């Protein structure tokens, strides 16, 4: 496939990980492998972040699991998956063949479960450039408080996952006023970057049955509705810790949305819900960023990071 030569340098550095551009898929929106390969050359995307994987096979939540909203989507899939070892054996080879840069996302409900999931990834090939810790999971050892809502818990889980000896990213929840402090704690514990932010807590009720629509009752809201929340979360975290690489996610639908996150302080970007509407959206946003930078005579996209703080 012919590559388009760009006049703007989109190179993105996230700790020790270097990507050709800042755009990635968000975990849970592009499957476990090369599902998007029929729509684009996966090498053109900064990285593919696979759906979060548990140490063991996981069945997920009861249906219904998805519900559209006026400006987004509620989901309560419950992190259904084949288990990290099965993924590495059965799904990873095809994704490697696509020459994509891969980020494996893992989750657990105890520190030990995170450790076990990471252990299965210790011998993954170099195409797996980073491990994303989905810390927006209930901690069964702390009254179901989310790992990403506790400085102590995020510290423990990041330190435990370091057994994998690959760059770590911590995906955090926006549903806490302590987000900048928790991001700093994750960084000090060994995360080279933080992903901000996961879904916002939400719910929908069927007025005829008078019951919650989702099978698990509660869910996470994603899509354009949460973009202002995520942009502020990135802004606040960058303001407190400008040295910390941030990957912004939440409601990105176009290059202009992506630029908001970059100016707020994001170095990398993930696109999620928009992929369901347009599986080519990542490529379109990359092209849009390049064109915007050329129009504004921006030579390196990294020069824009945190620009709204100047």
Segments from the language model and where they lie:
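Alpha/beta catalytic cores of nucleotide-metabolism and tRNA/nucleoside-modifying enzymes
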Residues: 1-6, 221-245, 253-310
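Short beta-strand/loop segments at the ligand-binding rim of alpha/beta enzyme cores
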Residues: 18-24, 98-103, 163-174, 239-249
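Glycine-rich beta-to-alpha transition loops that act as phosphate-gripper elements at the mouths
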Residues: 30, 105-108, 172-178, 244-256
């Amino acid at each position: 496939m012919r590559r388009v030569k760009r006049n703007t340098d989109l190179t993105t550095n996230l700790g020790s990980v270097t990507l050709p551009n800042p755009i990635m898929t968000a975990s849970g929106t592009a499957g476990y492998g090369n599902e998007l390969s029929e729509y684009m050359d996966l090498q053109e995307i900064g990285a593919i972040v696979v759906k979060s994987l548990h140490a063991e096979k996981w069945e997920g939540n009861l249906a219904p699991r998805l519900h559209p909203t006026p400006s987004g989507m509620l989901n309560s899939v419950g992190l259904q998956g084949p288990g990290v070892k099965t993924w590495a054996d059965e799904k990873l080879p095809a994704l490697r063949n696509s020459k994509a840069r891969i980020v494996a996302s893992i989750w657990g409900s105890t520190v030990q479960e995170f450790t076990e999931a990471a252990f299965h990834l210790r011998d993954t090939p170099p195409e797996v450039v980073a491990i994303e810790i989905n810390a927006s999971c209930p901690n069964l050892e702390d009254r179901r408080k989310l790992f990403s809502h506790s400085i102590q818990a995020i510290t423990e889980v990041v330190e435990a996952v370091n057994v994998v000896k690959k760059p770590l990213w911590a995906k955090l929840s926006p549903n806490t006023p302590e987000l900048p402090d928790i991001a700093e704690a994750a960084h000090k514990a060994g995360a080279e970057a933080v992903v901000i932010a996961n879904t916002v807590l939400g719910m929908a009720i069927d007025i005829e049955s008078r019951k919650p629509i989702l099978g698990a009752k509660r869910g996470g809201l994603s899509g354009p509705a949460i973009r202002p929340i995520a942009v502020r979360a990135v802004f606040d975290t960058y303001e407190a810790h400008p040295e910390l690489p941030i990957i912004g996610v939440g409601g990105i639908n176009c290059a202009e949305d992506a630029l908001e996150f970059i100016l707020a302080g994001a170095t990398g970007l993930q696109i999620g819900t928009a992929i369901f509407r347009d599986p080519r959206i990542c490529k379109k946003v990359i092209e849009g960023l390049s064109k915007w930078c050329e129009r504004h005579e921006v030579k390196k996209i990294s020069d824009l990071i945190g620009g709204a703080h100047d």
